[in-house]
């Protein structure tokens, strides 16, 4: 069951944040006005985990922002955080599914909830950013008809992850 985040369940937001396997990278290319990509597989996969979010109450209290939590038997196994963006799109700031529930429809259900929220709030579509090394996420977005709209090679340049490339995905209604 998907529930909107409230003050009461806000503590559950970081529960689905678990490591994922990095087994390669996407290599985007822009040719004749169209983004395409190939993939490079690593000989030695590794695990990566994002830091927990410091969740602020604005996602409970303010219009133009929302977070939704996916529960199974009272356990939070998925989350999505979304807000209005300056360009008319709803920006998915974060989506996460606990590792034991990946590829079982939880992410798709959360994405459908984000689409519903964005349409109710009159956005032109969804957008998000992920890293080139998160191939599973990139496949997920492509499978759900998102297209690459931009690539940023400098976004992470001041961080230990400077070798990662930001890929911006769009889904227009």
Swiss-Prot record:
Q: Which domain of life is it from?
A: Bacteria
Pfam families, from UniProt? Acetyltransf_1
InterPro entries registered for this protein in UniProt: Acyl_CoA_acyltransferase (IPR016181), GNAT_dom (IPR000182), Streptothricin_AcTrfase (IPR008125), YpeA/RimI_acetyltransf (IPR050680)
Which key words tag this protein in UniProt?
Acyltransferase, Antibiotic resistance, Transferase
**What does the record say about the knockout?**
Deletion mutant is susceptible to streptothricin.
Broadest EC class assigned to this enzyme: transferase
Reaction equation(s) it catalyzes? streptothricin D + acetyl-CoA = N(beta)-acetylstreptothricin D + CoA + H(+); streptothricin F + acetyl-CoA = N(beta)-acetylstreptothricin F + CoA + H(+)
EC no. given is 2.3.-.-
| SUPFAM superfamilies registered for this protein in UniProt | Acyl-CoA N-acyltransferases (Nat) (SSF55729)
The answer, when asked if Nucleotidyltransferase is one of the entry's keywords, is no
Query: What PROSITE patterns does the record tag this protein with?
Result: GNAT (PS51186)
Per UniProt, residues of the N-acetyltransferase domain are 21-173
Subunit comment: Homodimer.
Entry function: Involved in resistance to streptothricin, a broad-spectrum antibiotic produced by streptomycetes. Detoxifies streptothricin via acetylation of the beta amino group of the first beta-lysyl moiety of streptothricin.
| Protein's name according to its UniProt entry | Streptothricin acetyltransferase A
**Protein's organism:** Bacillus subtilis (strain 168)
Instruction: Give the organism's phylogenetic lineage.
Output: Bacteria, Bacillati, Bacillota, Bacilli, Bacillales
């Amino acid at each position: 069951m998907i529930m909107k985040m409230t003050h009461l369940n806000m503590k559950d937001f970081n529960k689905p944040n678990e490591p994922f396997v990095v087994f390669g990278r996407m290599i985007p290319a822009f040719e004749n006005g169209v983004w395409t990509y190939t993939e490079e597989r690593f000989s030695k996969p590794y695990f990566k985990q994002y830091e927990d979010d410091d969740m602020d109450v604005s996602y409970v209290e303010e219009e133009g922002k929302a977070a939704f939590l996916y529960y199974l038997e009272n356990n939070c196994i998925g989350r999505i955080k979304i807000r209005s963006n300056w360009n008319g799109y709803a920006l998915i700031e974060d989506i996460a599914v606990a590792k034991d529930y990946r590829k079982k429809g939880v992410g798709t259900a959360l994405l459908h909830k984000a689409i519903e929220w964005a349409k109710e709030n009159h956005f032109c579509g969804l957008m998000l950013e992920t890293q080139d090394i998160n191939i599973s996420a990139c496949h997920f977005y492509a499978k759900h008809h998102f297209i690459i709209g931009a690539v940023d090679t400098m976004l992470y340049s001041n961080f230990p992850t400077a070798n990662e490339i930001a890929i911006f995905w769009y889904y227009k209604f």
